[in-house]
């Protein structure tokens, strides 16, 4: 009985660890805050926000 309880708890611990790895490696969607481009799903971090394409407000900002 002790062996079965130990193996079940180890199995559950592995599942929890795998879920944590998946959650920490998930990319961020457009509109989410970011610090680096690799954190965003489209690999585009503009002024601490995931945006694709990068839109720079200014004189000639004509992206549509």
Swiss-Prot record:
Annotated Pfam families: Conotoxin_I2
Residue ranges the record assigns to the propeptide = 61-64
Give the record's keywords alphabetically.
Answer: Amidation, Cleavage on pair of basic residues, Disulfide bond, Secreted, Signal, Toxin
Subcellular location per the Swiss-Prot or TrEMBL entry: Secreted
**One GO CC annotation:** extracellular region
**Keyword Disulfide bond in record:** yes
Which positions does the record annotate as the modified residue Aspartic acid 1-amide? Answer: 57
Q: Please give the family membership noted in the entry.
A: Belongs to the conotoxin I2 superfamily.
What note about domains is in the entry? The cysteine framework is XI (C-C-CC-CC-C-C).
Protein name in UniProt: Conotoxin Im11.2
